[in-house]
């Protein structure tokens, strides 16, 4: 009985956090430090929502899919224009310079692990309204297909079934020390080097991670030291 009460309390607390961070369109990972929409954060969040709020789960994923690029890329980050002090912001990524970038959303130019099909399946399996869930799957199917086609086409040029990452943030293990030696072996031109806005000063509540900026369309071989993760099954 005591264990069940503890579990119920944890569930209530988790729901309270999600409710507090819900914007009406997506869930902020952290209202102060991370106020925008992150790709796989939203997928995991939708998996949680689908167990008690089907509409919110589908809205979370729909908002992310609305920012999908024309070439199928599902961005790691969708910016909320109400929060302009976050770094690196849209002016760092210059995503709008790509003809494939979405027209109505500012995004980053990198991706995160593709768990979105799993999230969509969870939404269907736990749906209270099956008809609505099927409508959502019909909407999401083409989005997910384009997303995975992008990964196979752009990130597996040798057809090995191994999708490579272009940036540590794409792995989901952003701050892992496994990247330290790899990043030290990269040599960038001056126009590719990390830049920091002159007016940007980190506070105790806003600590910027080290950033490496690549060109808009870097060409790395699959033998690159960053070629890792996601083997096709």
Task: Describe each region flagged by the PLM.
Residues 6-14, 22-33, 119, 130-151:
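Long hydrophobic alpha-helices with heptad-repeat/coiled-coil character
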Residues 138, 148-233:
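Extended ligand-binding clefts on enzyme/binding-domain cores
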Residues 25-43, 47-51, 88-113, 230-233:
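Solvent-exposed loop and edge beta-strand segments that line ligand/cofactor-binding
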Residues 20, 36-38, 91, 167, ...:
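Short, low-complexity intrinsically disordered segments
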Residues 12-16, 20, 28, 32-34, ...:
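Generic detection of intrinsically disordered/low-complexity segments and helix-coil linkers/edges
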Residues 1-37, 58-59, 63, 71-77, ...:
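Low-complexity, Ser/Thr/Pro/Gly-enriched N-terminal "stalk/linker" regions
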Residues 54-141, 145, 152-173:
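Helix-terminus loop motifs that line ligand-binding clefts
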